Every structure is written in C-alpha cells, then in structure tokens.
Amino acid sequence: MLLKQLPQAVQQIRCISSATTAVTRLHRSVYCRLYPTVVVQPDGSTINIRYHEPRKIIKLPLDLSTLTDAERRARLEARKPRKKVKIMEEVEDNFNAKKYMKYIKKK
C-alpha cells in the first residue's frame, strides 16, 4: 500500500544497492563498448565477463608461491627467451683465376 503512494523514481532507487547490482545481470541487450570475454583462472575454472577490449579469453597468471621448487624452476626456465642458433655458413673458397685465363680474349 505504501509503495503505491511513492513516485515511480523513488521505487526504482530503493531497489538499487551494491549487493544487488553485483549479482544481477545487465538489463540491456547491448551494453556500449563492453565485449563478452572468458576469464580462465589458474585452477582451470572459467568466468564469463564483459571487458572493455575485444578479447575472447583472458588467462590469469599462476601463483608461483603455491608450486614446488621443481615446478617453479621449470616455469621460470620456460619464461626465459630461447637462444637463437647461429648457423655459420662455411664457404669454400678454392677459386683459382689462373685456371680460367685461357678463356679470356685479349684485344
């Protein structure tokens, strides 16, 4: 009975709180400049969110303090850039110009 007497704007403000807005969905079919994105947590679970950049998947980093020493060392080694193998081409220079002097015509 009391809600019927209040104006419509006051009734809407009464329903908005930080708890309900975090739990409910967006009530718009198109939300400007936010893109559907999947967040993958370190344990493999996923969460669907809206993100300001057009990305499909965001993978959160793993906490290294929870790993064993061997796993931590293996992950840190995988992060380091790989060294490029330099290929040295050996050119055999056994060209002898005197061998071809007979083919040159003198004028």
Curated annotation (Swiss-Prot):
Transmembrane segments: none
Protein purpose: Involved in mitochondrial biogenesis and G2/M phase cell cycle progression.
Origin organism lineage: Eukaryota, Metazoa, Ecdysozoa, Arthropoda, Hexapoda
KW Secreted (keyword) present: no
Record key words, sorted: Developmental protein, Mitochondrion, Ribonucleoprotein, Ribosomal protein, Transit peptide
Record's keyword annotation contains Disulfide bond: no
Record protein name field: Large ribosomal subunit protein mL55
Transit peptide start and end: 1-16
Phenotype when the gene is knocked out: Flies do not grow after hatching, moved slowly and died as first instar larvae.
